[in-house]
């Protein structure tokens, strides 16, 4: 089911807590109508939480934690993107670099099926050179990130490419939105391992 919250200036009630059951996963669209009197803009966005699918995928691969963290962020960003576009097919986020993390891949279908994997230099991580570094640009070095939308049927394939930049997947995606879509975009992501869950 698709849900969308539309919140106007008189509807918003502030709370210092937002809680959900620990394993619930969702992508929730929202729309803030803005207020001429308060001079606030209209804002469309997504709130995403993917505990169970991210944990299941990462547990299958046994990657070092810095790679798990970047891959988890990529899954969240790709899942949000999949609900942003009219999708009847697959959206793919793929990054290639010449650092110790060489490949990052994630795709989501219009049915919500999620896949993700990474390729990396095991020796570099075995020597503990990168075990404390969670920054995308440091781990991938020079490279690019590509976004591909493949629609079912006769629709065209779309691909956008941007150079890797910043510390996170969200930083590179933000640059892509700014350059390609020319839409002011802000992505705020947070990834954390709590016990055995991501």
Residue ranges of predicted features:
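Interaction interfaces in information-processing and related assembly proteins
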Residues: 4-198
């Amino acid at each position: 089911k698709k849900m969308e919250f539309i919140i106007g200036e008189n509807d918003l009630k502030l709370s210092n807590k937002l809680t959900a059951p620990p394993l619930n996963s969702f992508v929730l669209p929202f729309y803030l109508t803005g207020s001429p009197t308060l001079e606030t803009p209209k804002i469309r966005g997504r709130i995403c939480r993917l505990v169970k699918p991210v944990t299941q995928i990462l547990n299958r691969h046994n990657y070092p934690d810095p790679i798990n963290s970047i891959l988890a962020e990529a899954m969240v960003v790709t899942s949000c993107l999949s609900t942003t576009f009219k999708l009847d097919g697959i959206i793919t986020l793929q990054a290639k670099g010449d650092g110790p993390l060489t490949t990052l891949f994630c795709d989501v279908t219009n049915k919500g099926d999620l896949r993700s994997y990474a390729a990396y230099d095991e020796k570099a991580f075995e020597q503990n050179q990168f075990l404390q570094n969670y920054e995308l640009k440091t781990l991938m070095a020079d490279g690019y990130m590509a976004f591909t939308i493949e629609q079912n049927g006769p629709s065209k394939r779309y691909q956008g490419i941007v150079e890797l930049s910043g510390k996170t997947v969200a930083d590179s995606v933000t640059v892509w939105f700014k350059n390609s879509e020319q839409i002011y975009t802000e992505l705020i992501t947070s990834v954390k391992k709590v016990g055995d869950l991501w």
